[in-house]
């Protein structure tokens, strides 16, 4: 079989960076964020969060090839707002939202278990 070993889809090799940032020379005020060992799950949620920011003009992602375990997120912002700042803010907001979701989920489980007993 030509498929790579399953562990290659999530394990970073020695010297491999999780995220690399490259300036997009085709478009003003834009960057390409390459995230290794991730797929559509993270790409779509980050893109959606970036698009909630009014200073983000464009946000999109692609998976270069199904056997390559990485996503490339392209972000273009207004001139007074850097793509790196937009990306950092989106990640911070997502962490907050997911922490709140986890807290509510755990509370609902606890309430349900107390109701059963």
Curated annotation (Swiss-Prot):
Residues annotated with N-acetylmethionine modification: 1
Database matches in InterPro entries: RBP11, RBP11-like, RBP11-like_dimer, RNA_pol_Rpb11_13-16kDa_CS, Rpo11-like
A GO cellular-component term linked to this record: nucleus
BP GO terms, sorted: transcription by RNA polymerase II
Keywords, ordered alphabetically: Acetylation, DNA-directed RNA polymerase, Nucleus, Transcription
Transmembrane segments: none
Superkingdom classification of source: Eukaryota
CDD domains, sorted: RNAP_II_RPB11
Principal subcellular localization: nucleus
Sample GO molecular function, one term: DNA binding
Pfam families hit by this protein: RNA_pol_L_2
Compartments it resides in: Nucleus
Summary of subunit composition and partner proteins: Component of the RNA polymerase II (Pol II) core complex consisting of 12 subunits: a ten-subunit catalytic core composed of POLR2A/RPB1, POLR2B/RPB2, POLR2C/RPB3, POLR2I/RPB9, POLR2J/RPB11, POLR2E/RPABC1, POLR2F/RPABC2, POLR2H/RPABC3, POLR2K/RPABC4 and POLR2L/RPABC5 and a mobile stalk composed of two subunits POLR2D/RPB4 and POLR2G/RPB7, protruding from the core and functioning primarily in transcription initiation. Part of Pol II(G) complex, in which Pol II core associates with an additional subunit POLR2M; unlike conventional Pol II, Pol II(G) functions as a transcriptional repressor.
Stored HAMAP family: RNApol_arch_Rpo11
PANTHER family in UniProt: DNA-DIRECTED RNA POLYMERASE I,II,III, DNA-DIRECTED RNA POLYMERASE II SUBUNIT RPB11
Family that this chain belongs to: Belongs to the archaeal Rpo11/eukaryotic RPB11/RPC19 RNA polymerase subunit family.
Protein known as: DNA-directed RNA polymerase II subunit RPB11
């Amino acid at each position: 079989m030509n498929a790579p070993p399953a562990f290659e889809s999530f394990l970073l090799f020695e010297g491999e960076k999780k995220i690399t940032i490259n300036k997009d020379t085709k478009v003003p005020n834009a960057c390409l964020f390459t995230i290794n060992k991730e797929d559509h799950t993270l790409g779509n949620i980050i893109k959606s969060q970036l698009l909630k920011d009014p200073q983000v003009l464009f946000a999109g992602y692609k998976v270069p090839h199904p056997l390559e375990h990485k996503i490339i997120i392209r972000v273009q912002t207004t001139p007074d707002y850097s793509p790196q700042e937009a990306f950092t803010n989106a990640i911070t907001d997502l962490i907050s939202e997911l922490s709140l979701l986890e807290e509510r989920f755990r509370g609902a489980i606890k309430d349900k278990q107390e109701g059963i007993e």
